Amino acid sequence: MAKKKAFIPFFYFTSIVFLPWLISLCCNKSLKIWITNWWNTRQCETFLNDIQEKSVLEKFIQLEDLFQLDEMIKEYPETDLQQFRLGIHKETIQFIKIHNEYHIHTILHFSTNLISFVILSGYSFWGKEKLFILNSWVQEFLYNLSDTIKAFSILLLTDLCIGFHSPHGWELMIGYIYKDFGFAHYEQILSGLVSTFPVILDTIFKYWIFRYLNRVSPSLVVIYHAIND
């Protein structure tokens, strides 16, 4: 009975890891049809921001230029204007369908992320006792490690998160989150986040070493600085 109770927090942690994937899978299947019908039947105005509107106009201009170029390189004695307009019309309809699919995908992912956040928040709130047990297990495991292993682990983690090559990883991660929530790609915003977020983490980490580790384990701080130097 005691072993069974001891495994309950472990099962709870496993459920937290896989619960977002299950929520995403269920929401994508159940909400996609509803959101698609709502978007297509309502025929609401597209809520474009300045970045998205500029992107749409650029794609329309590129589409028209490609058709004009295609007609110019053809060695026909006379240009069939009606056929040209028909091709433009078909490609425009196809582009509108793709644009609608993009908005449906954006709404679907944003709704799924919001639902996942609400469910996980409630799940974590009702399982505070299990989280407390897991936290005690982690603290006990870290406490039993030697100071050398702790210092090496801290150094490895900081180099991965805020090291010289970390901006490439942050760029991929922030870009994925930015895209998953349906925001339009904006290079300046992404560059700003990539350049400032690791700096903020570095400052917080140095403050944590100065404020917490110096008080709890001064020897760990000495070993960390020795390895880092």
Curated annotation (Swiss-Prot):
It holds the Pfam family CemA. Its main location: plastid. GO terms for biological process: potassium ion transport. InterPro entries: CemA. The chain crosses the membrane at residues 6-26, 107-127, 189-209. It is a multi-pass membrane protein. It catalyses: K(+)(in) + H(+)(out) = K(+)(out) + H(+)(in). GO terms for molecular function: antiporter activity; proton transmembrane transporter activity. Keywords: Antiport, Chloroplast, Hydrogen ion transport, Ion transport, Membrane, Plastid, Plastid inner membrane, Potassium, Potassium transport, Transmembrane, Transmembrane helix, Transport. It comes from the Eukaryota. GO terms for cellular component: chloroplast inner membrane. It is found in: Plastid, Chloroplast inner membrane. Contributes to K(+)/H(+) antiport activity by supporting proton efflux to control proton extrusion and homeostasis in chloroplasts in a light-dependent manner to modulate photosynthesis. Prevents excessive induction of non-photochemical quenching (NPQ) under continuous-light conditions. Indirectly promotes efficient inorganic carbon uptake into chloroplasts. Belongs to the CemA family. PANTHER family: CHLOROPLAST ENVELOPE MEMBRANE PROTEIN, CHLOROPLAST ENVELOPE MEMBRANE PROTEIN-RELATED. This is Potassium/proton antiporter CemA. The gene is cemA.
